[in-house]
Amino acid sequence: FYEHLGPIVTTNPCGEVLLYPNEPCNLGSINVWKFARHDDDGNSYVDWEALKEVTKSCTRFLDNVIDVNNFPLKAIEEMSLATRKVGLGVMGVANLLYELKLPYNSEEGRKFMEQLMEFISYWSKVESIELAKSRGNLPYYDKSFYKKGKLPFRGADLRDEWHFDWDKISNDIKRYGIRNGYTTIIAPTGSISMIAGCSSGMEPVYSLVFEKNVAVGSFYYIDPAAEKVLREEGLFNDKVMEDINKNKGSIQNVDYVPEKVRKALVTAMDITPEEHIRALASFQKWVDSSISKTNNFPADATL
């Protein structure tokens, strides 16, 4: 996305951001499950206004991190301050889909994922433009394609799929500048999602139920969003957890669970490779750099 900065030489450890020589990138992730709400009839929806404000705050926070960071090398500091890449991503996506009763591998689920990522991408760009007004433009702006009115994600070229006025974003960037070279990247969040108690990155839930063995015996751990759905359906009990565990963490062969519930509570191993790729594409359309993708195989998989 830049001219005359040399070749892309590396990625970060999980591959979601492509980097020029000496270039770092600060990452952060929003637990989107936290924005699920319920109306008086018990129907789930997303609090888009709250998500907008958090997206803007997170973008500002990540820009702050660049300026307060301690860098091991002067060359890294100089490159970080010049390109000012930040990567705001997501976690809790699969949990949010459970709450909304949208199957991860359905057309409706993929459309929602596109809508979600376009929303975060848009408001992160809005905030980065506001930061440029108050703090100064991206130092390497003149070396970027922003000055030509281009945006660093594929969705910008797909006008028929826009839900926001991306022409305004492009024009505002040309008029006011933009603070950050990138604003959106999706990391795997393998550790921080465990701390937050939600699903990782944009991935489907790996298993609905885990059996934990300890000194005094064993007990089941169930995905919290799946538990919520099962409780709403009056299906949450020890038997259903045992049956899911016997089916390798999947509810698909637990016949007494209604089909609509089974369709909503799909796991990574229930989804075909093609469906994984389609979900990935739904997010990638609105992401500035790339996405870390986890591929799961059964223990008896062969090459």
Residue locations for each model-derived region?
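Short, solvent-exposed polar/charged micro-motifs at secondary-structure junctions
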Residues: F1-L5, L151-R154, S250-D255, L303
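Function-dense linear segments that define catalytic or interfacial modules
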Residues: F1-S80, G92-L100, C198, E203-A225, ...
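Catalytic alpha/beta core of large soluble enzyme barrels
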Residues: E16, L62-D67, W162, D172-R179, ...
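Short, flexible loop/turn elements at secondary-structure junctions
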Residues: S29-K34, V90, A187-P188, A299-A301
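Structural signal for hydrophobic packing residues in well-ordered secondary-structure cores
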Residues: N31-K34, L51-L73, A94-K101, M117-P139, ...
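Internal maturation/activation junctions in enzymes
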Residues: V54-E77, L81, P103-P188, E259-K263, ...
